[in-house]
Amino acid sequence: MASFRLFLLCLAGLVFVSEAGSVGAGEPKCPLMVKVLDAVRGSPAANVGVKVFKKAADETWEPFASGKTSESGELHGLTTEDKFVEGLYKVELDTKSYWKSLGISPFHEFAEVVFTANDSGPRHYTIAALLSPYSYSTTALVSSPKA
């Protein structure tokens, strides 16, 4: 159990370090970023399908954004500051397709993270996931936007 906690601490550190790096010269940070790591291979998880939903007034989940992780396991540019308003969001990772592409039969169909965003004013969110075929762990880094 202690090694698992240490691993989660290392994952949080990795997210912090990736968040500290610049996305591009002069580019503003995106308000929502996803980072996915493969715990089996010890590497970024590339080409993981990501869907983001926003909870509507009628309690249904409406599609908000989508994409695939890059070779670095990251997905930037999902939304803009103007569109990423206060609300309940769900990030869904297509873990089944990822593991199947590697010839592995996974337990989970997908991994999801549901969170409230921007309820205390504008924030930037990095959602990080650590995947294995039979488990997943998530963490988040929430920071104030930089001017």
UniProtKB/Swiss-Prot annotation:
InterPro entries: Thyroxine_BS, Transthyretin/HIU_hydrolase, Transthyretin/HIU_hydrolase_d, Transthyretin/HIU_hydrolase_sf, Transthyretin_CS. The modification Phosphoserine is found at residue 72. GO terms for molecular function: hormone activity; identical protein binding; molecular sequestering activity. GO terms for biological process: negative regulation of glomerular filtration; phototransduction, visible light; purine nucleobase metabolic process; retinoid metabolic process. Glycans are attached at residue 118. It is found in: Secreted. Detected in serum (at protein level). L-thyroxine binds at residues 35, 74, 137. Residues 1-20 form the signal peptide. Sulfonation of the reactive cysteine Cys-30 enhances the stability of the native conformation of TTR, avoiding misassembly of the protein leading to amyloid formation. One of its GO terms (cellular component) is extracellular space. The modification Sulfocysteine is found at residue 30. The modification 4-carboxyglutamate is found at residue 62. Keywords: Gamma-carboxyglutamic acid, Glycoprotein, Hormone, Phosphoprotein, Secreted, Signal, Sulfation, Thyroid hormone, Transport. Its main location: secreted. The keyword Transport applies. Thyroid hormone-binding protein. Probably transports thyroxine from the bloodstream to the brain. Homotetramer. Dimer of dimers. In the homotetramer, subunits assemble around a central channel that can accommodate two ligand molecules. Interacts with RBP4. Belongs to the transthyretin family. This is Transthyretin. It comes from Bos taurus. The gene is TTR.
